[in-house]
Amino acid sequence: TEVHQEYETTKKFIDNFPDSKNDYAPHEKSMKLMPLATHIVEIVGWPEIMLNTEKLDFAAGDYKPLHFTSREELKAKLDEFYAKSQNALSQLSEDGLNGKWAMYMGDQLLADFTKYSAIRHALNQLTHHRAQLGVYYRLTDIPVPGSYGPSADEQYM
């Protein structure tokens, strides 16, 4: 499945994560490397949340950011979140994808999706942020794994 393929690609990026550069950011407005990688790992767990809830309300504290300090923590959580998402997806009927899922900030509706659209959005977010991580890697001379084919680093290995 696409979720599995995106997990495998994400795993390659997390396997290359440099523990020595947790606080690196290419610009003052950019996320630091560890929070970016943490966010990517969290996104892999979003399908499970989206399938087992009807909404997420930031104001109510439904989202609690994770804080990691090492590649090993990232890898462990990535595997855990993937397993939970795969389990939720395996128990889902096709009709279940038509259910509603929304994001709120208190009374303000931020996003209103079908469960299918919410998962599709999560996969888009995963691709977007993983590409950011690839730029960070390139700027710090860390090998960039290929996502949908070999990267420049892999072509010459």
Each PLM stretch: what is its role?
Residues 1, 70-75, 120-123:
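Active-site rim elements
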Residues 2-5, 9, 76-87, 128:
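A non-catalytic, amphipathic alpha-helix used as a structural packing/dimerization or gating element
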Residues 4-11, 21-64, 104-157:
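Short, contiguous alpha-helical
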Residues 14, 44, 82-89, 130:
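A structural signal for well-ordered alpha-helices, especially hydrophobic packing surfaces
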Residues 35, 72-73, 96, 117:
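An acidic, carboxylate-rich microenvironment
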Residues 49, 54-93:
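Helix-adjacent hinge/juxtasegments
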Residues 91-108:
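Acidic catalytic patch
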